[in-house]
């Protein structure tokens, strides 16, 4: 055993090189460069200036697309809200047009008023002239008068409608009944008494007439 140990030690001593290590004579600068090359990892290609510019462009384009999508959504929301506002406005215009256009019932009332006015009914003296003119213009088909609103005439005729239309329906059913409404200026005379009525004059033989028997 002792012989084996001695032979191993001699072999190791013989195998050791006689010259010193080369890097012992190198300067410190060369050692630092070698350390930087082998120890420090090289800068990756992803982080070069060109790649950084491309990445920044991609990020900018994505942000622009996102902003465009948001603007489009805002425009759609604004158009929907504006369309909702336009719908009630059109409905209001239709309602106003319906109010402006005279109905057949209203024209019938005006015709009754003008027809009864010819009978010199005293209650119909308060009928405004604007209603008569408007009725004539509607019959003639004058568009200027048809476009005018009917609100003013309705206000003028509103204060005597409830009192007169009960009589108008009766007079319409019986046209001759309009003559029974006498003017306010007429004076009523008392009816003659029975004593003033003259007795009928007959022949003397009128009481002696005999009826034939059948």
Curated annotation (Swiss-Prot):
Mammary gland specific. Secreted in milk. PROSITE patterns: CASEIN_ALPHA_BETA. Residues 105-111 are annotated as: Opioid-like peptide sequence. Residues 69-91 are annotated as: Disordered. Its main location: secreted. InterPro entries: Alpha-s1_casein, Casein, Casein_CS. It is found in: Secreted. Keywords: Milk protein, Phosphoprotein, Secreted, Signal. One of its GO terms (biological process) is response to dehydroepiandrosterone. Residues 1-15 form the signal peptide. GO terms for cellular component: extracellular space. It holds the Pfam family Casein. The modification Phosphoserine is found at residues 27, 56, 61, 63, 79-83, 90, 130. It comes from the Eukaryota. Important role in the capacity of milk to transport calcium phosphate. Belongs to the alpha-casein family. PANTHER family: ALPHA-S1-CASEIN. This is Alpha-S1-casein.
